[in-house]
Structures are given as structure tokens and as C-alpha cells.
Amino acid sequence: MKRPNTGAKQLTSEKFSSNKAPLRHNVLVKNIEEVKGSTVCEACSIESNQAPQDMAYTPGKPFPTHHAQNASDYLNAALSAERWIATFEHKTPEGIFWQQDASQPIDLSLYSGSAGVAYFYLKLTEVTGNAEFAEKARCGLSYAAAHWRDLLLPEQAAFQDNREGVPGVHLGAHMGVGGVGLVLIEGAKTFTESKDAEKYRRAAQAIGRFYTDESAQQGESGPYWTGSPALLMDGGIMLFLIALYETFGDQQLLEFIKAAGAQYLRWSAESPRGGVDFNGAGIETPFDWPNFAFGSAGSGYLLAHLFRITGDARYLEVARRCADFLDAVAVPQKRGKLIPHKLGGDDEFTVFYLGYCHGIAGTLRFPTLMGTLDNDIRWATMVNQLADGAEALGAPEHMSAGLWNTVCYCCGHAGMAHTFLGLYCIDGSPRWREFATRCGDILLGSMKTHADGSASWPFAWERVHPEELSQRIGFYDGAAGIASTLLELFMLERDDYHWPRMIDDPFPEDPRR
């Protein structure tokens, strides 16, 4: 999801005990020696200079597909991915971290680093009930609890910020400190009867105090951090604080959130196109990213949560006006509409991402949440129009400018499948289930199986360089997130779907029957 520099201001489940794994899905995996390895083949290097022919990018080209014959096909693929991820595991006295490139700083983030991999192991444990997977999750969480401040070290902060081209992301909730906090919250809720739960709770609350007492700056109406409203930046920090408040309770924290919300509202701008715009790309940039990670879709989502926890109608009204802006910039397709990746510049209105970061897999979460708070048919209409627009571009089977040769959770099919499974949980529509399953066919079809039985996914990380493929392990950018989606599809096919969700994920945990 690498983007140009925005110029933003830079700042330095299922509950079970540690001794008893859940058997909700009755697929206890006892011997993971069959699905893990200690080496990785030479072909699994981080960067690949030449794309396999079936994953080379051509607009309109079909993605490789493989249709699952039964639910176990999804589980086996996820377990093969775990085997590959495990080859990058590093044990320390304080726990486990995962790292592909030893020449780079240790990546602790939810997005692409160890916190995201630990989150995958949480999900793998919930589904399989395997005690060794649970131990890996606990050890990964323990390392994150001990080392989250490492993300603030100059070398690590620069690594995160420069890789994404956005100063300040090391403070945010995806690539920074807040994302580690979100995973620690999930760990505390999952291992509720374990002595480790208290460790994770304390670390998550320490991250909360870092945001409230150390890194916050004072604006005209309240505190802020980076000065960008993007969910990747201040918006995501606020989502973490809301999750922290709702999980552990703290009236003083709620008052802080209210003050930060007042400051956040100051960043709204009346758009000449209509509605209200929150431009996370920065007010000095000549362009605007309107979707979930950086734009008004993500800001509207945060405002909906602020309305939900405070009852302050100002947030609901501005969220509605964010939707007005998105409606104003949406571009009609042969069917439905799509919101462009970017407003302004030579490619304005021409590229339509379909993933989480700048596309429907993320943006659909905004009308979904609003539909639970605001009794207006417009939210269901928005969901259907965006889904129609995606299919009009040939998704999920065909490549396009905004769905290039990528399948990861951030930009591709793993994120789309997750969102459409969430929509299926709301209304049980066969359409949503079928769309998710079609995405699953592509995840299986694009999987690269190695001689040792492990599996990875070669895909292009950067849209502007589709010839450069990599095989990554992270949650948003690699195998951990893809494998997590495969676990969801496994549960769906077994008619036993259950998925505890983070705060950026507004869908029900279970399908409504």
C-alpha cells in the first residue's frame, strides 16, 4: 500500500485458559510437525525478480483459480501457510517475533510484522484448538507486550514511515503502536483465564497512557497526534482508544476521547463537490484519497463509533455528510458505482481500488456500521451499489488497474472475502457468500506450494510495479492475513462460522440465522 509522502507532521473470541484449548470447531490439530517446517526453500526469498506466468499482470486477465472440493482444502492451505511463516520465527527469552529480512529493523506492527502474525496465531488457535499454536500466539503477544516501545526508536520509526512514505504512521493503528495495542486487547480477551491476560492488559493500557499522556499535542479543541485524520494515523489511534475504553472501562479515558473527537471535527472541510471531506493525504497535497485508510470513508466510520459511544448527534450528522461526499465523487460503472482511488492528478476518476486500503473491502465497512445506527435505506443502497461496481469491473476473477496481481488482505482478495463474509453474517444473502467463495478460489489458485509442503503467495505489492513480486508473511501484506481468510472460509463451509472482531471490523461475529 505504499503511497507518496503526504507531508504530514512527523512525531518522534472464544475465551479459554492457557491449559485448555477451545474445541468449537472440533478440528483439534494435535501434531503440527506435519504442518510446520524449519527451513524455507530458496524460491521463498522475500523478493522475486520474475513473476510466475499465471500471476503476471495484464488488465482483464483472469486470476488463477482452484475451487475447494471440501472445507478441509481451506484449512490445509492455511496450515501450509503457517508452516512457511514458522520458518521466519525467532525465539527470545521474552517471547517470539517473526522477521523475514534480518538486515531490517524488527517489524512489530499489526500490518506487516510480528503483532499481525501473533494475531493470525490467535485465530488459528480458535479454529484448530491446537495447544502449540496457542503457545506461539502467547509468545508473540508477550514479545509485543515487552517491546512495543521499540516502534518509537528512531531507526524503527523511520523504517515504518519511509516504507509507506507517510511520516507518522509508526504512531498509528495499522503500522504503529496502536495496532500492537489492538492485538494485545484481543489476546487479553482470548486468554482470559491465563496469567498472561493480565500482562497483555497492562501493556495495552500502557499504550493508552502513551497516547493520552506522552504523545498527544493540544489543538484548538482537544488533543491530537500527527495532524492527519486518516485511519492510518489519528483516526486509527482514536479507534484503539475506543476499543481500550470498551474492553477495560475508564471514564477518564472516555472524556479524553470526547475531547479528541472535538478536535477531529475541526479537520472536516466543506467540499465543493458536495458533503464534507476529511483528506488524510494532507491539506497541502494536490490530491485526495477518499476511501477507508486515508479518506472520508474511514473518517465517517470513526465518527459513527464516536456517536455510538457518546450519543453526540454532531458525529452522526458529520458522518452522514461524509457519505454525501462519497456519493458526490462516486463514478457510475456499467452496474453500480465505485469511489475512485484518488481525486486530483492525471489519474483522477480512472483507478478504482477494490481492497481494504483504498477500495470497497474497507469502504463498505462505513455504510455497514452506519446501517446499525441510522435507520436509512441509503446505507444498504450504498453497499449494493459498490458491490455492483466491483463486479462490473470483473472482480473478483479478473485483474484491473485497482485489482492488479495482488491477493493480500490490504489490497486484494483476502480483504474482499473477509468483508463479503461479514456482509453474509448480516443478512445471509447467497450473493455475499458466493462472492467470498469466488475470492477463495483465487486465494487457492494463486498459492505457491513448496517442496516441504509449506505455502506462500507471490504477488505484486506496489500497483505501479506489477512486475515486482514478493512473498510476505504479514497480516495485511502477506500470508498471515490470507491464511486467516482461508480459516474463515473453512468455518463457513462447515456451517460453524464464528469470528471475533477488532474495532475496524463492524460485522457480526456469527451469521444471523
Give each language-model segment a name.
Residues 2-4, 9-11, 16, 24-513:
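Glycan-recognition and catalytic cores of secretory/periplasmic carbohydrate-active enzymes
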Residues 21:
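Short polybasic linear motifs
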